[in-house]
């Protein structure tokens, strides 16, 4: 039997359908409120509002659970590779061996970008932030694929593959241009993560040998950042896509949203905070500053809009961080890691943080791993964009396949 919630306005009762979720909280359907009750609902930041139906990602913030298509994030990080997870998000099931091989071949085939795109890079000054370059380059792909300006359902799969394939190439080109080095072409026999590291760190005169520990760590980071429900950048992609905008334009809007320091730029802020603290002996001082409502200092890397428990991605990254630093001989002498571990231990025992359910999030350890890999801080958000493109494309595809999809129009 159908269930309803009752809303009483000016003495009149309105019955609102309660929609049953396959997992998690049920939802009150308020879509007819404005038409029937002559008023709107008000929810700044969409704190209590579901904007769409989705079967891609599930989060239980109170229990610290994150699942993609029913698979726990910790299992995917430990047992899968990034393109396998990409296939899962886009198609809804893990691939068979044959499906995986075909998918990876298609991604490799589409990793090159049009040579004319090189001229676009030359219009930027050498000090340009790689995210600025990447945002423009991804948007410009619309000019190279005019057939997708009026895309059809048959284009969804190829579009997703093209985007996943070209984003790491553009990301590496953005980095190379920012440091004045020649672009490095993809090397298709390498897997997805190896190929990106090759394009980042090889030069025409120097071959880059990929450290397997670093490759595996980056693979995990990409998996952990692949999708996360209707966050700011994903919602931006969906809103842009709801107008029928071409997919390259939609992804560029996601990149713009991700660039914000409250979203994709948070791990860089964690590194800056750890450097500011400087030594473990100063941690109590900064804990006190974080508690002082009159002090502008914020403890970066703690707390999350959704999680009121330990972010499951942070738990994986903490161990990954130790593995990488141990392999690189930095485990016992990396000052940032030592400060981070002690800061976490102190904060998790402090009543102020316990009462407010402030736990380490995915940004707390990822920046330390990137720094150990030799990836500069201005590239942190770029790497986030590489991973999240998979989620953006899965969400974009799901939105266009939804028969109830409408153009987004907040009131």
Swiss-Prot record:
Belongs to the citrate synthase family. It comes from Rickettsia conorii subsp. caspia (strain A-167) (Astrakhan rickettsia). The keyword Oxidoreductase does not apply. GO terms for biological process: tricarboxylic acid cycle. Keywords: Transferase, Tricarboxylic acid cycle. It catalyses: oxaloacetate + acetyl-CoA + H2O = citrate + CoA + H(+). PANTHER family: CITRATE SYNTHASE (PTHR42871:SF1). Pathway: Carbohydrate metabolism; tricarboxylic acid cycle; isocitrate from oxaloacetate: step 1/2. The keyword Transferase applies. This is Citrate synthase. Disulfide bonds: none annotated. Its EC number is 2.3.3.16. Citrate synthase is found in nearly all cells capable of oxidative metabolism. NCBIfam families: cit_synth_I, PRK05614.1. One of its GO terms (molecular function) is citrate (Si)-synthase activity. Transmembrane segments: none annotated. The active site is at 304, 363. CDD domains: EcCS_like. GO terms for cellular component: cytoplasm.
């Amino acid at each position: 039997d159908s269930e309803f919630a009752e809303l009483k306005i000016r003495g009149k009762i309105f019955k609102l359908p309660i929609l049953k979720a396959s997992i998690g909280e049920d939802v009150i359907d308020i879509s007819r409120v404005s038409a029937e009750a002559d008023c709107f609902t008000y929810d700044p930041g969409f704190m209590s509002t579901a904007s769409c139906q989705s079967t891609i990602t599930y989060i239980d913030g109170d229990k610290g659970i994150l699942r993609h298509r029913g698979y726990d994030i910790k299992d995917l990080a430990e047992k899968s590779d990034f393109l396998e997870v990409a296939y899962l998000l886009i198609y809804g099931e893990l691939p068979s061996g044959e499906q995986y091989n075909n998918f990876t071949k298609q991604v490799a085939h589409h990793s090159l970008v049009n040579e004319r795109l090189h001229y676009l890079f030359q219009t930027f000054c050498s000090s340009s932030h790689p995210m600025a370059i990447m945002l423009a380059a991804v948007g410009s792909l619309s000019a190279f694929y005019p057939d997708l300006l009026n895309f059809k359902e048959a284009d969804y799969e190829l579009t997703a593959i093209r985007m996943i394939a070209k984003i790491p190439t553009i990301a590496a080109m953005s980095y190379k241009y920012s440091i004045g080095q020649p672009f490095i072409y993809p090397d298709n026999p390498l897997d997805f993560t190896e190929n990106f590291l090759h394009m980042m760190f090889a030069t025409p005169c120097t071959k880059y040998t990929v450290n397997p520990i670093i490759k595996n760590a980056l693979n995990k980071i990409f998996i952990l950042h692949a999708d996360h429900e209707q966050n700011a950048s994903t919602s931006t992609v969906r809103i842009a896509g709801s107008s029928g905008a071409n997919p390259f334009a939609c992804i560029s809007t996601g990149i713009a949203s991700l660039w914000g320091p409250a979203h994709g730029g948070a791990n860089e802020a964690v590194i800056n905070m750890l450097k500011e603290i400087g030594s473990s002996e100063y941690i109590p001082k900064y804990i006190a500053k974080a508690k002082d409502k009159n002090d502008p200092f914020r403890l970066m890397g703690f707390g999350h809009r959704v999680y009121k428990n330990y972010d499951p991605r942070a738990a994986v990254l903490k161990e990954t961080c130790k593995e990488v630093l141990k392999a690189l001989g930095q485990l016992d002498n990396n000052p940032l890691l030592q400060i981070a571990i002690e800061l976490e231990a102190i904060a998790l025992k402090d009543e102020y943080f316990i009462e407010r359910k402030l736990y380490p999030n995915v940004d707390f350890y990822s920046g330390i791993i990137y720094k150990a890999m030799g990836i500069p801080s201005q590239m942190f958000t770029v790497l986030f964009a590489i991973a999240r493109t998979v989620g953006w494309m899965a969400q974009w595809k799901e939105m266009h396949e939804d028969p109830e999809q409408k153009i987004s129009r907040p009131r």
